[in-house]
A protein has these predicted regions:
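Conserved nucleotide-sensing/catalytic segment adjacent to the nucleotide-binding pocket
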Residues: 25-77
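Fold-independent oxyanion-binding glycine-rich loops
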Residues: 7, 47, 119
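Short linear motifs at secondary-structure transitions and domain/linker junctions
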Residues: 21, 52-54, 89-93
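Short, solvent-exposed loop/turn segments at secondary-structure junctions
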Residues: 10, 49-50, 83, 122
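Glycine-rich P-loop/Walker A and Walker A-like loops and their local beta1-loop-alpha1 context
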Residues: 1-30
């Protein structure tokens, strides 16, 4: 699995598609589709969006994602970096940001490579 992370609107998707020769048909958008609809697409967009539904169900996102990581061994995951902006106002928003941070850390630990994209430029972290 390869992980690409970065801030909002920094070109993560375009970077992934160009550098890993992926097309629109290779994309699964976790912000728009339930995870159960994943059908082998190699590029998983908005992986951080998987966290909130699990939290709302009282589940632990870092546990829930484990079976999926085995299925995604050949996938490229894109996730948004959190924690570099304003502190969220509500306790629920702070809990979500913290959970996404732990989730991204787990993804990075499990990934073969980790790249950070800023201004459309990739930097290899792992």
């Amino acid at each position: 699995m390869k992980l690409i992370l970065g801030g909002y609107a920094n070109g993560r998707t375009a970077y992934a598609m160009q550098n890993y020769q992926l097309t629109e048909s290779d994309c699964f958008d976790a912000a728009a589709e339930p995870l159960a609809r994943w059908n082998g697409q190699r590029l998983i967009l908005h992986a951080e969006q998987l966290v909130n539904p699990w939290l709302e169900q009282g589940k632990e996102p870092c546990t829930e994602i484990l079976p999926w990581l085995e299925r995604w061994q050949n996938a490229v995951l894109i996730t948004q970096e959190v924690g570099c902006g304003l502190v969220p106002v509500t306790p629920q928003q702070r809990q979500l940001r913290e959970a996404v941070g732990h989730f991204n850390k787990l993804l990075a630990e499990c990934a073969e490579t980790v790249e950070r994209v800023c201004c459309g430029l990739g930097m290899q972290l792992k």
